């Protein structure tokens, strides 16, 4: 019997992730309204959006924590809605997720946290797991920290430990949810640099959800802006910076919504009125 070898060029050119008219609802309320875009192999895509834009729901749907109401998610050329449970398990093993709050278990050491996916999803010997844990911690700059507790780590070190755990299964796709949240600018810059180094070293496809523009400009190959559950714009950092779309400009230039601006004006007016009243009271007492 003659078999045909897979077309490696076609596989390389195929998007790593494709979303087609993806919709997600919570009860009667639709959160994502027909999201469609591709994520190419080896690229870093940053998903931007304000609070309540739907970007976190999109990320949770991509990693399987939310089920779409309709539409399609394709990963590595496979439609997640039609594959077998065994194929789904294989795909999940190719995904790594670093959560916003690090999500480390306080009752475990750092090494035990990193080892958890290996112990849950593989039959590797403990000696092999220990070697892999040390290797991953070294790759994120935490060599020698395997016996520390999460409570003994700084915020930036917790983020790095979470990245090590996300990487321990050697994923092809790595997801980050607000990797710079809660970090001071210097530590946040270190996490950005780590993401760049991981991409360079392991050629992974990386998807980052953030609202930190400085971080997005540094790490992104492309950006997609989500607003009210819709894709507003998508392009390279250069294309996004030069966009004239009003919603893109509003987000990138950090212009408040009209309703928010009116609230701020009202608060400013109240503050000024109170300041005038206090000054008048001081003059009367004098």
Q: Which residues make up each language-model segment?
A:
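Helix-to-loop junction immediately C-terminal to a conserved catalytic motif
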Residues: 63
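A short, proline-enriched helix->beta-strand linker immediately N-terminal to the Walker B motif
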Residues: 168-172
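A short, surface-exposed alpha-helical micro-motif characterized by mixed small hydrophobic
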Residues: 216-218
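Conserved ABC ATPase signature
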Residues: 149-153, 157
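Catalytic Walker B motif of ABC-type/P-loop ATPase nucleotide-binding domains
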Residues: 174-177
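Conserved ABC ATPase "signature" region
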Residues: 78-79, 126-144
């Amino acid at each position: 019997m003659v078999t045909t070898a897979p077309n490696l060029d076609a596989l390389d050119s195929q998007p790593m992730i494709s979303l087609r008219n993806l919709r997600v609802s919570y009860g009667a309320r639709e959160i994502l309204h027909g999201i469609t875009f591709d994520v190419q192999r080896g690229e870093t895509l940053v998903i931007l959006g304000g609070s309540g834009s739907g970007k976190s729901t999109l990320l949770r749907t991509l990693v399987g924590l939310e089920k779409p109401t309709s539409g399609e998610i394709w990963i590595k050329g496979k439609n997640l809605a039609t594959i077998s449970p065994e194929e789904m398990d294989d795909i999940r093993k190719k995904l790594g997720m670093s959560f916003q709050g690090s999500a480390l278990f306080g009752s475990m050491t750092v090494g035990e946290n990193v080892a958890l996916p290996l112990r849950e999803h593989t039959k590797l010997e403990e000696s092999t797991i220990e070697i892999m844990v040390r290797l991953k911690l070294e790759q994120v700059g935490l060599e020698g920290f395997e016996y520390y507790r999460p409570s003994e780590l700084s915020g930036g070190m917790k983020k790095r430990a979470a990245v090590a755990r996300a990487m321990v299964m050697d994923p092809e796709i790595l997801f980050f949810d607000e990797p710079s949240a809660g970090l001071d600018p210097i530590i946040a810059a270190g996490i950005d640099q780590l993401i760049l180094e991981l991409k360079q070293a392991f050629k992974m496809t990386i998807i980052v959800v953030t609202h930190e523009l400085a971080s997005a400009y540094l790490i992104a190959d492309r950006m997609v802006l989500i607003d009210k559950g819709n894709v507003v714009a998508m392009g390279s950092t250069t294309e996004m910076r030069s966009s004239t779309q009003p919603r893109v400009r509003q987000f990138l230039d950090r212009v408040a919504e009209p309703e928010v601006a009116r609230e701020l004006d009202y608060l400013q007016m109240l503050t000024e009125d109170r300041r005038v009243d206090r000054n008048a009271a001081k003059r009367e007492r004098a």
